[in-house]
Amino acid sequence: MSLVIPEKFQHILRVLNTNIDGRRKIAFAITAIKGVGRRYAHVVLRKADIDLSKRAGELTEDEVERVVTIMQNPRQYKIPDWFLNRQKDVKDGKYSQVLANGLDNKLREDLERLKKIRAHRGLRHFWGLRVRGQHTKTTGRRGRTVGVSKKK
């Protein structure tokens, strides 16, 4: 960052219901949005023709708007399907990139669906146990420890 801050520098940007630190480089700053990782951020910025060495606070309004539209409609900007975080959606079979609040909603809906159809994963979530096949005999214990009293 240069020693002199530009006049139109924004220290905090509000993008997709998320506060973004304007002092960070743009590629890493937009990873604060849920559903946007470093790889996706780089691809979006390349498609939007934005210099990766810029700070987030240096972006103009139309540049921010361009980044948001590309993030929300990645297939229109020729970002491949395998790059997206929601592939072959269970309900409509579409490919999309789910961001911010939509990601929380989709995750909750998926868990509710698994619980409703009484799938093994759904039941494990319901019971509060490990879901991905880990051993649970000794690790992952919660609650108070049960002590053993010594025999006299």
From Swiss-Prot:
GO molecular function: rRNA binding; structural constituent of ribosome
Domain of life: Eukaryota
One of the record's GO cellular component terms: small ribosomal subunit
Subcellular localization: Cytoplasm
Keyword Ribonucleoprotein listed: yes
Keyword Oxidoreductase on entry: no
Primary residence: cytoplasm
GO biological process: translation
Keywords associated with the record: Cytoplasm, Ribonucleoprotein, Ribosomal protein, RNA-binding, rRNA-binding
InterPro entries named among the record's database cross-references: Rbsml_uS13_C, Ribosomal_uS13, Ribosomal_uS13-like_H2TH, Ribosomal_uS13_CS
Similarity section: Belongs to the universal ribosomal protein uS13 family.
UniProt subunit comment: Component of the small ribosomal subunit.
Annotated function: Component of the small ribosomal subunit. The ribosome is a large ribonucleoprotein complex responsible for the synthesis of proteins in the cell.
UniProt name for this protein: Small ribosomal subunit protein uS13
